[in-house]
Amino acid sequence: MGTFTLHQGQSNLIKSFFRNYYLNAELGLPNDMELREFALQPFGSDTYIRHLSFSSSEELRDYLVNRNLPLHLFYSSARYQLPGARDMEEKAWMGSDLLFDIDADHICKLRSIRFCPVCGNAITSEKCERDNVETLEYVEMTSECIKRGLEEARNLVEILEDDFGLKPKVYFSGNRGFHVQVDCYGDCALLDSDERKEIAEYVMGVGVPSYPGGGENAPGWVGRKNRGINGVTIDGQVTIDVKRLIRIPNSLHGKSGLIVKEVTNLDDFEFNEALSPFTGYTIFLPYISIETEVLSRNIKLNRGVPIKIESSIGIYLHLKNLGEVKAYVR
């Protein structure tokens, strides 16, 4: 049984789903895309292709569909004079957007299981000695955890708008959290890493004192502290990095098959199948027996027993390592 291999990018069926999506996808590209570095992780590879440059959406689409189909797709938060240069100094940095990353799994304690895809047994090590294969890990993302991440995004937006006068945009990351982005020009774009660190620490509540009185409706941190908000849980390194890569809006996340989607109304966001572009049904073959929450639905899988299920769910389960999509059923 040692011949078993698995890679998220090995399935030709999954590749066909992604390729068909990118044939017509309207990617959310910046209006200065010719100044941005593009990067991607292609199917069948663990490494990124970087230092790409495109001048139009048509040129980018042709590259993605006909040359390197992406499992993950990015552009740089930075603008460069020569974005395609391989040397970072040669690129000549011109400024960057301001980014914040909220990972729901940093907020919640999530259920995870490591298992052998051949025998289906739960195994704590990275290899199943009996079947001589690498084990896989599944982490259950719940709707409740996503809701908590959304609340963090809501608090962050309030701080950026009220305390800094900025106009942030919120994006569902396509997997387990939210990205908050401020399109920066002028002085904002030229903030260095130290200045961005100060902003990150401010929104995290680092060094912000408690203020007596004022009530919950008081402005700024006075009101927030009285509402029990002591800071926003973000990945500070993302904000500090002036050359960070951003997932392209309306691209697909290769660990879920869900769309990286702008959330224009935080009250309307739901973690469900509508985040997937895939329609129809698939035949899914589970590696293990498990009951789990998937896109706000409870799903029961039995090891080795094929199940007909919506493509949105089947592709999600496949990319989460729980089994394989074996066929597409219209």
Swiss-Prot record:
It is an enzyme of class 2 (transferase). Keywords: DNA replication, DNA-directed RNA polymerase, Magnesium, Manganese, Metal-binding, Nucleotidyltransferase, Primosome, Transcription, Transferase, Zinc. Pfam families: DNA_primase_S (PF01896), PriS_C (PF20873). The keyword Magnesium applies. It comes from the Archaea. Signal peptide: none annotated. Catalytic subunit of DNA primase, an RNA polymerase that catalyzes the synthesis of short RNA molecules used as primers for DNA polymerase during DNA replication. The small subunit contains the primase catalytic core and has DNA synthesis activity on its own. Binding to the large subunit stabilizes and modulates the activity, increasing the rate of DNA synthesis while decreasing the length of the DNA fragments, and conferring RNA synthesis capability. The DNA polymerase activity may enable DNA primase to also catalyze primer extension after primer synthesis. May also play a role in DNA repair. Heterodimer of a small subunit (PriS) and a large subunit (PriL). This is DNA primase small subunit PriS. It comes from Saccharolobus islandicus (strain M.16.4 / Kamchatka #3) (Sulfolobus islandicus). The lineage of its organism: Archaea, Thermoproteota, Thermoprotei, Sulfolobales, Sulfolobaceae. The gene is priS.
